[in-house]
């Protein structure tokens, strides 16, 4: 609600309708609190908001299968405008930038690199870039991937690397690893 009121107080609605703005605020609040949510999962809420605005009964909003599949095509643009308005830095550095230097440093296998790339892609489902530096994310993912594939001979190198070369990420390394392990565990449970 704070996002919605803050935005509507300082901005006009120009091309954004209230349903899209409301849903975007709900999505952002959910992402901040819990992590990634698929846009398809918002269809029912979007149609419910549309039906309330048109004066329809809220009980019929989920009954029509055709309308339940309709979502706002503009939702991502509204989210970007809202984040931009709030001053959020939309130029986010990606963990991929550090992958080649980690590959040179630890000389891990192609299998490990593929797992690392998949885990970096999956990490976008959690707001890791908001909480951790991309270098920390890349290093934590490398650690988890090497641990998952039992490349024990390299694990001590990572600890030494953190201790000697990257002292400044030491405090955020273990919390990032914990989140990634939970992500990997939940993904393995789904498969």
Regions found by a protein language model. Name each.
Residues 1-177:
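Structured all-alpha helical bundle cores of eukaryotic regulatory proteins
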Residues 176-191:
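C-terminal regulatory segments
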């Amino acid at each position: 609600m704070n996002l919605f009121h803050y935005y509507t107080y300082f901005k006009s609605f120009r091309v954004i309708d209230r349903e899209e703005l409301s849903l975007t605020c709900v999505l952002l609040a959910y992402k901040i609190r819990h992590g990634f949510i698929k846009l398809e999962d918002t269809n029912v809420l979007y149609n419910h908001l549309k039906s309330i605005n048109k004066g329809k009964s809220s009980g019929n909003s989920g009954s029509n299968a055709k309308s339940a599949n309709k979502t706002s095509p503009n939702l991502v643009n509204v989210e970007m405008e809202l984040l931009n308005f709030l001053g959020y830095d939309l130029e986010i550095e990606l963990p991929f930038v550090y992958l080649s230097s980690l590959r040179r440093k630890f000389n891990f296998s192609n299998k490990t690199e593929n797992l690392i790339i998949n885990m970096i892609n999956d990490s976008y489902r959690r707001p890791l870039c908001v909480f951790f530096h991309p270098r920390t994310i890349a290093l934590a993912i490398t650690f988890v991937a090497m641990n998952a594939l039992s490349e024990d001979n390299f694990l001590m190198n990572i600890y030494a690397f953190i201790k000697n070369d990257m002292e400044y990420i030491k405090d955020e390394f273990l919390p990032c690893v914990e989140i990634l392990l939970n992500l990997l565990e939940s993904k393995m449970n789904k498969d």
